[in-house]
């Protein structure tokens, strides 16, 4: 998680991809040829229902590096969480908090993080009930302040508006769309065999696997194999809008392969990995010089049917 000296708050969130549309906005890019003019921008819609903070996890360091040294689980857990993990039973949350507080006081704790999970059962467009559970960082440099914040939000629901704001810069991580096993032409974009070579039984294959010596096929040679369904992170995406008014974005007939948005959502400039209904993880940027460019001025959001 990125280092931050801001006030303690969650550094990440999660949502489910809905689809794409486009908006008309005022170009606020400095020195752009269209600065101050209306431009059309493609956006991705991500539905972001509130997530619950399930536990506090404290980290300490020894000669082998950083490791977890204490956890405190809330007693306020949703029944759907049992579909994912076996939550601790007969857990004394007060004793666990007291233990972590003591470790914070003596300087043993180096970092405080939160265990959060989503509630996809509240979404009509995502056909699953099993929550997605994840560890989320907390901003701030003081472990004591981070622990006090963690105690306040333990067991509560956190909205996306409590974490990010309009115009903010974020990183997104997701599993890309899977294409199964594909050949080297589609997978790597190599050229087809030409002329006489194409009539000798190898039209969509690589010309050579390498030299005779060394007698080894390099990993650089484009070959067939799995294409897609990989975890990928894309950096420095801009949030254009955070809202709960779904009527502003729902197109006629709903989004393809998803349906209607009914709760909180965000609009991200450009595309994000993965198909609709897939989990999209959001976090504060790790490679950005600024955390926000400023709130964008959106003139129009397209609600034209996406059915074709």
Where is each model-derived feature located?
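Extended basic (Lys/Arg/His-rich) segments that typically form rRNA-contacting surfaces
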Residues: 1-177, 181, 186-308
């Amino acid at each position: 998680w990125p280092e931050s000296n801001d006030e303690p708050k969650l550094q990440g969130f999660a949502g489910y991809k809905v689809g794409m549309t486009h908006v008309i906005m005022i170009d606020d890019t400095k020195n752009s040829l269209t600065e101050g003019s209306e431009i059309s921008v493609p956006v991705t819609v991500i539905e972001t229902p509130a997530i619950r903070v399930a536990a506090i996890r404290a980290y300490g360091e020894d000669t082998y590096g950083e490791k977890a040294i204490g956890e405190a689980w809330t007693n306020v857990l949703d029944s759907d969480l049992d579909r994912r993990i076996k939550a601790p039973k007969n857990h004394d949350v007060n004793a666990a908090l007291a233990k972590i507080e003591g470790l914070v006081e003596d300087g043993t704790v180096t970092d405080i993080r939160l265990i959060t999970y989503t509630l996809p059962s509240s979404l009509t467009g995502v056909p699953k009930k099993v929550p997605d559970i994840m560890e989320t960082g907390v901003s701030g440099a003081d472990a004591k302040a981070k622990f006090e914040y963690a105690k306040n939000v333990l067991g509560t629901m956190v909205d996306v508006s409590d974490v990010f704001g309009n115009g903010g810069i974020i990183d997104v991580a997701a599993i890309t769309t899977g294409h199964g096993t594909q050949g080297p032409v589609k997978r790597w974009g190599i050229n087809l065999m030409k002329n006489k070579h194409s009539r000798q039984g190898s039209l969509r294959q690589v010309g050579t696997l390498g030299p005779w010596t060394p007698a080894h096929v390099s990993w650089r040679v484009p070959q067939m194999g799995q294409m897609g369904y990989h975890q990928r992170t894309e950096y420095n995406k801009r949030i254009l809008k955070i809202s709960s008014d779904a009527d502003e974005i729902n197109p006629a007939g709903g989004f393809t392969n998803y349906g209607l948005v009914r709760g909180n959502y965000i609009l991200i400039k450009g595309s994000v990995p993965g198909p609709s209904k897939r989990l999209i993880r959001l976090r504060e940027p790790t490679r950005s010089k600024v955390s926000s460019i400023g709130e964008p001025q959106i003139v129009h959001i397209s609600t034209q049917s996406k059915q074709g």
